Amino acid sequence: MKYKVVSTDHRNTRIEIDPPQRIVSLVPSQTELLFDLGLDDRVVGITKFCVRPEKWKKTKAVIGGTKNFHFDVIESLHPDLIIGNKEENYEEGIVRLEEFFPVWMSDIVEFQQALDMIRSISLLTQTERKGAAIIDTIEKRFKRLYQFPPLRALYLMWRNPWMGAANGTFINTIIKRTGLINVLEDEMRYPELSASKIKELDPRVVFLSSEPFPFNPKYLQEVQDILPRAKILLVDGEMFSWYGSRLLHAPAYFRKLREMLGIV
């Protein structure tokens, strides 16, 4: 007897579908989760920004970007489940997809919401045991995470204009879990920042993220000139902003960051 899988997503939208066999993922961090859940044979489409696992760029259909879907490609794949995210995708595109396909959307700011997403997707895809194991390991590794001293930190994720990660973001949640103080805690989302504002914030540590703006060593001095006393570090943006199974690797990465800051 055929049965349905039922799930309510983070928008409180309920979907009831046959166990999915043709999945399209619209978000890089959730694409990696699908791989870690062992769904290689059931994922048929990903975005051009879905870089993990690397081999999927060669074996899966690329359906465009996270904010510009190629609807003809998606339609040709005949998906029975599309998985997206409120922040990373665009409402107009999601509404259009929902006219034809089941769409499950995440909306993640808090740590527990990330774990809930992993649990929900594992239930939808009948990989509950693997999902539970991933969640259990993430929780254990974060519980063992040594906290940073309460240093004032600024996380920059864009240049020209400068933009930082403030309250109401998953990045802010991760910064706080490390023990650091986000100097943009009183702001919301991703505020634009002038050089004078950055000086006024007076962070002790500045993280230059690898994404979405690809900060590299040539930008270190530019920020150092604004904040001569601060420690400026290039960081892997995936470790701060990816809310899927990449969280398995974040605690070990933060230990390395402690060493880079000279914190034993």
Spans of model-derived segments:
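N-terminal ligand-binding lobe of clamshell/alpha-beta domains
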Residues: M1-V264
